Each structure stands twice: as C-alpha cells, then as structure tokens.
C-alpha cells in the first residue's frame, strides 16, 4: 500500500502546484512561464516507465482515479489560460523561431498526413482553443478552409485575433455556436475533435444526426496513463461508425 500512497501523493502535489501556479499567473503574467514548465513536466512524467508501471498497478483504484480526474481538470484549465496568454503575446517572428511551436506544428502535419485533407477540404476543428496551432497549420499547409469551434467565447475572440495577425483569416474562422445551428457543417468534409474535448461521445452522437455519411472524423483522446492530461474515450463505436 505504501507504493499506492506515494503515487497518490505525487499526483496530488502536481495538481496543487499547477493550481497554485494558475492562480499566480492570473495575478502576475510572468508566472505563466513557470506554469508552462510545470505542464511540460506533467507531459514528461506521463511517459516515464515508472509512472506507466504505477498506473498499471493502481489504475483501477477509485481513490487514485478520482485524484487523476482532478489533476486532469486542473491541468486542462491551466492549459487554457496558458494558450490565451501565448496568443496575446506571441508574434509571427517569435512563432517562426520557436522550437516548441515548430515541433508542435510538425506533429500536427505528421498526424494529418493520412487524413486526406487538400485545398478542396472544409475542416471543422472542435475544441480549437485560444492558441489554435492545429487550425492555422491545416489552413497554411494544406490550403483548406477551416473553422475552429470552441465553447469558450473568450478563446474564440482571441483565436480570431491570432488568425488576423498571421494573415490567414481568409481561410480560417472561429465560432462558439452550437453544432445544431452551425451552417458550416453543411459543407464540412473533415472533422477533428480535440483531445481536451470532454464530452466526446455526446459530440459524436450529435454529429451522427447532422453530417453526411462521407464526412471523415478524427477523434483525439488519451487512454491509460495518457488520461492524466487527456480526456479518455472508452466507447465501442463499431455499430454506428465506419472506423479505420
């Protein structure tokens, strides 16, 4: 049992640190750098062999799972704040020379290679956030028309400003509308659902009633130990969707 409580304590400490740094950052923006470092640390911890081993042992423990859920919610809230700060402060020159962003953009490009997006595509990105790197990359690299959708109206406003700053607003738009009233769905050819979208099954159930059967959907999620910083997805879709 000692191992369990050591693991539980490490998760609680991470949650506490991220929560406090989020509060500090809202009061003093220079703390966002510390918060970003802590979120990077969380990403590194997720892939460590020791973390994976501990997760395999304690993943079904209710107390551990509750604490992991709290950490994920805290980290997701912190990431939203970090993205808003980055979007407000970063310039085009900084983006071109930023190693982290360059790596992230390349990761997006690699992830979408098999998704058959081209200049004729109309892409809906659900959960685009305030720092919509995926949306901007799709438009810039593939020449596709992209709409980013997010429930956070402030994030939508900031994302619009980013698109304008990067001179790509002719291909990119953002909205906080409900799926049921989104006119863009009528012309959508591809849909991407972000990993930090919590209610994925509800979104899929809505889409099933709203889209053409030929629309391609990419569902991003993190199961297992990756659920520490990603919302998991554990539903069988074989009866309702054609899967690749």
Where do the language-model regions lie?
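Conserved Class I S-adenosyl-L-methionine-dependent methyltransferase catalytic core
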Residues: 40-118
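Conserved class I S-adenosyl-L-methionine
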Residues: 119-130
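Conserved SAM-binding loop of SAM-dependent methyltransferases across substrates and taxa
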Residues: 130-144
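C-terminal substrate-binding/active-site "lid" region of AdoMet-derived donor-dependent transferases
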Residues: 204-244
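Conserved SAM/SAH-binding beta-strand->alpha-helix loop
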Residues: 151-154
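Conserved SAM-binding loop
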Residues: 159-160
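Conserved SAM-binding strand-loop segment of SAM-dependent methyltransferases
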Residues: 167-179
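A short SAM/SAH-binding and catalytic strip from SAM-dependent methyltransferases
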Residues: 187-202
């Amino acid at each position: 049992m000692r191992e369990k409580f050591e693991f539980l304590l490490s998760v609680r400490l991470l949650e506490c640190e991220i929560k406090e740094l989020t509060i500090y950052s809202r009061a003093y923006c220079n703390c966002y750098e510390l918060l970003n470092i802590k979120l990077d640390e969380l990403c590194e911890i997720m892939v460590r062999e020791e973390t994976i081993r501990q997760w395999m042992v304690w993943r079904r423990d209710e107390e551990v799972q509750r604490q992991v859920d709290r950490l994920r919610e805290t980290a997701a809230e912190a990431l939203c704040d970090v993205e808003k700060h980055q979007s407000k402060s970063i310039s085009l020159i900084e983006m071109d020379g930023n190693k982290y962003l360059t790596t992230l953009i390349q990761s997006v490009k690699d992830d979408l290679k098999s998704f058959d997006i081209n200049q004729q595509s109309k892409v809906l990105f659900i959960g685009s956030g305030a720092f919509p790197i995926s949306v901007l990359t799709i438009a810039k690299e593939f020449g596709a028309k992209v709409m980013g959708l997010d429930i956070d109206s402030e994030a939508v406003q900031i994302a619009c400003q980013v698109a304008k700053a990067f001179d790509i607003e002719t291909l990119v738009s953002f909205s906080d509308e409900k799926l049921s009233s989104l006119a863009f769905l009528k012309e959508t050819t591809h849909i991407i659902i972000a990993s930090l979208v919590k209610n994925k099954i509800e979104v899929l159930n809505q889409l099933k009633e709203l889209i053409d059967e030929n629309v391609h959907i990419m569902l991003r999620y993190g199961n297992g130990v990756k659920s520490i910083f990603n919302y998991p997805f554990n539903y069988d879709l074989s009866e309702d969707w054609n899967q690749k």
